[in-house]
C-alpha cells in the first residue's frame, strides 16, 4: 500500500481548477475492481484499516489493484477534481457516481483505471508536478486527465508540446481517413449507376497505386522496365563508335536500333503521362507535381529533336537553306543538352519506390538543414582558401595554388574528405592548413547530418504507416464490395449513407489506429 503524506500549507498544490467545469463526465463501471481486489487479497483483513481516527484523517484509494492511503487534506486542495469531490459526498449514491465501487467497512474507493497514469496524477496532487509517461500513449494519458478532472495546462511545457503534436497528428489522420473512407463508400454505392466514374476509379488505381491489384502491378513492372531500357540505351548511345557515326552524319544499324528503342520508350512514357492526366481530377495541380514536371522535361526533348530534324531536312533541300542550316547547327548544342535530360526518367522510379519517396520527402523537410550545411561549407571555404594560398605562395618550385579562386576547389575537396590529389600543399604551413580544413570539414558536416538522419527515419516511418493504412483500407473496400455483391439492394442503401454517418462509424477505429501509431 502506498502512503502519501499530505501538505498542510499547500505550498506545492495550490492550483486553480476554474476551467474544470467544462470537462465531460465519464460514466463508471460498477463492482469490477472491488471483486478483483477481493480475489487478489482473499486472506487480508481490510477492516483493520477502518479505525475511527484513520477514517477521519485518511482515505484509501484502490486504482487497478494498487492501494493509496491519502490524507483528506491533500484532496481538499483540489476540490474540483474527481478525487476532491469525494470529500463532499453525503450519501452512497453520490459516491457511486464518482467511483466504480466503494467498500463501506474499510472506507476504500475502487477505480477501474490505469494504475500507471494514476501514479503520475497522484504525484501531481501531492507535489504539483505533472509529466507524461514514456511507456504510455499521450492520447491515452489525455483521457486519464479528463477522467480525473486534471487540466492539461498543468503539464510541463515539454510534455504539453508532445501532447499537442500527437493531437495534431491524430486529427490529421482522422480527417484523412474519414474523407477517404467516405469517398470510397460513396463510389462503391453508386458504381453501377455511374459507369464512367467506375472506369476512372479503376484507371486511377492502376496508374497510381501498384498495390491495388494485378493490373496495377503489371503497369508498374512495365513502367520500371522501360525506365531501365531507357537508361541502358542512353549509355550505349554515348559509346565512341556511335558518337563518331553521329558526328559524321551517318546512321548504321546500331544507331537505327537505338533510335527505334528510344522512340518506343518515349511512346510508352507519353501514353503513361496521358493516362495520368486523364484520371487527374485537378489538371492544374497535376501539372504542378514535381514528378509530372520531370516527366515533361524528359519527354519534350525527343519531340523537339524530331521537329528540328524535320526542319533541317526541309531547309537543306531548298536552294537558299544555308542560313537556316547554320541556325540549326547552333541549336544542335541545345538539343544535345535536352536529349541528355532523358536521364531524368530514372526519377520516375520514385513512383514505385518507398525509399526514393522518403528521400524526396526528407529533402523537402530538411531545406533549412541543407542551407545550414551549405553555409558552413562556404564559410570554411572562404577561410581556408586564402590561408593555403598565402602559405603556398612562398614556395617557388612548383606553385599549384595560383590564386584564391583556384584554392576554392581544393578547400571543398579537402573538407569533404574526397582528396583528388590534383592540388597538394607542399610547404609545412600549407600542410597544417590542410589538416585544419579536413578536421573542420568532418566536424562541421556532422552537425546537420544528424538532424537530416532523424528526419529521414521519421519520414520513412510515416510513409510506411501510410502505405499500411492504404493496404488495410483496400482490404476493407474489397470486403465491402464482396458484401455488397452478395447482399442485394438493401446493403447498397446502407453503403450510400451520408458523410456524417460514415465518419462516425469509422472514428473509433481511426482513434485506436492513431494511438497505436504513437
Curated annotation (Swiss-Prot):
Leader peptide range in chain numbering: none
UniProt keyword annotation of Transmembrane helix present: yes
Stretches of the chain found on the membrane's Cytoplasmic side: 1-214, 280-290, 353-367, 461-518
The protein's name: Voltage-gated potassium channel regulatory subunit KCNG2
Extracellular side: 237-257, 312-331, 390-404, 425-431
Role description: Regulatory alpha-subunit of the voltage-gated potassium (Kv) channel which, when coassembled with KCNB1, can modulate the kinetics and conductance-voltage relationship. Modulates channel activity by shifting the threshold and the half-maximal activation to more negative values. Potassium channel subunit that does not form functional channels by itself.
Alphabetical keyword list: Cell membrane, Ion channel, Ion transport, Membrane, Potassium, Potassium channel, Potassium transport, Transmembrane, Transmembrane helix, Transport, Voltage-gated channel
Record note on quaternary structure: Heterodimer with KCNB1.
Amino acid at each position: 500500500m502506498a502512503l502519501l503524506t499530505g501538505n498542510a500549507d499547500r505550498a506545492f498544490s495550490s492550483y486553480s481548477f476554474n476551467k474544470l467545469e467544462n470537462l465531460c463526465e465519464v460514466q463508471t463501471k460498477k463492482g469490477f475492481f472491488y471483486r478483483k481486489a477481493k480475489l487478489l487479497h482473499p486472506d487480508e483483513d481490510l477492516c483493520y484499516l477502518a479505525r475511527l481516527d484513520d477514517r477521519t484523517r485518511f482515505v484509501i484509494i484502490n486504482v487497478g489493484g494498487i492501494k493509496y492511503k491519502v490524507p483528506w487534506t491533500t484532496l481538499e486542495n483540489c476540490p474540483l477534481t474527481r478525487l476532491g469531490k469525494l470529500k463532499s459526498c453525503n450519501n452512497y449514491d453520490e459516491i457511486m457516481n464518482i467511483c466504480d465501487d466503494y467498500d463501506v467497512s474499510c472506507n476504500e474507493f475502487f477505480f477501474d483505471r490505469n494504475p500507471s497514469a494514476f501514479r503520475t496524477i497522484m504525484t501531481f496532487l501531492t507535489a504539483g508536478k505533472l509529466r507524461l509517461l514514456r511507456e504510455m500513449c499521450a492520447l491515452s494519458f489525455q483521457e486519464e486527465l479528463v477522467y480525473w478532472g486534471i487540466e492539461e495546462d498543468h503539464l510541463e511545457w515539454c510534455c504539453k508540446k508532445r501532447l499537442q503534436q500527437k493531437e495534431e497528428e491524430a486529427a490529421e489522420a482522422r480527417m484523412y481517413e474519414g474523407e477517404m473512407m467516405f469517398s470510397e463508400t460513396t463510389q462503391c454505392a453508386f458504381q453501377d449507376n455511374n459507369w464512367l466514374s467506375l472506369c476512372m476509379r479503376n484507371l486511377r488505381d492502376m496508374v497510381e497505386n501498384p498495390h491495388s491489384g494485378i493490373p496495377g502491378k503489371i503497369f508498374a513492372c512495365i513502367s520500371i522496365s522501360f525506365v531501365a531500357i531507357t537508361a541502358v540505351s542512353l549509355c550505349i548511345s554515348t559509346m565512341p563508335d556511335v558518337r563518331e557515326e553521329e558526328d559524321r552524319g551517318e546512321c548504321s544499324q546500331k544507331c537505327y536500333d537505338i533510335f527505334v528503342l528510344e522512340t518506343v520508350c518515349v511512346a510508352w512514357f507519353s501514353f503513361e503521362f496521358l493516362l495520368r492526366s486523364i484520371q487527374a481530377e485537378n489538371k492544374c495541380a497535376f501539372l504542378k507535381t514535381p514528378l509530372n514536371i520531370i516527366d515533361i522535361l524528359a519527354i519534350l526533348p525527343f519531340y523537339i529533336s524530331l521537329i528540328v530534324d524535320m526542319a533541317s531536312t526541309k531547309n537543306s533541300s531548298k536552294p537558299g537553306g544555308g542560313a537556316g542550316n547554320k541556325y540549326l547547327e547552333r541549336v544542335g548544342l541545345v538539343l544535345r543538352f535536352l536529349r541528355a535530360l532523358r536521364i531524368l526518367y530514372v526519377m520516375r522510379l520514385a513512383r514505385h519506390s518507398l525509399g526514393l519517396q522518403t528521400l524526396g520527402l526528407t529533402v523537402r523537410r530538411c531545406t533549412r538543414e541543407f542551407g545550414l550545411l551549405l553555409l558552413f561549407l562556404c564559410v570554411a571555404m572562404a577561410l581556408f582558401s586564402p590561408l593555403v594560398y598565402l602559405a603556398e605562395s612562398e614556395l617557388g618550385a612548383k606553385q599549384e595554388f595560383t590564386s584564391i579562386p583556384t584554392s576554392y576547389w581544393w578547400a571543398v575537396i579537402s573538407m569533404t574528405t574526397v582528396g583528388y590529389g590534383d592540388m597538394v600543399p607542399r610547404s609545412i604551413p600549407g600542410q597544417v592548413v590542410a589538416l585544419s580544413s579536413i578536421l573542420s570539414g568532418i566536424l562541421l558536416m556532422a552537425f546537420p547530418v544528424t538532424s537530416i538522419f532523424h528526419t529521414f527515419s521519421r519520414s520513412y516511418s510515416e510513409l510506411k504507416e501510410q502505405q499500411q493504412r492504404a493496404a488495410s483500407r483496400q482490404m476493407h473496400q474489397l470486403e465491402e464490395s464482396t458484401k455488397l455483391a452478395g447482399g442485394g439492394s438493401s446493403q447498397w442503401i446502407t453503403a450510400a449513407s451520408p458523410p456524417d454517418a460514415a465518419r462516425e462509424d469509422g472514428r473509433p477505429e481511426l482513434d485506436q489506429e492513431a494511438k497505436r501509431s504513437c
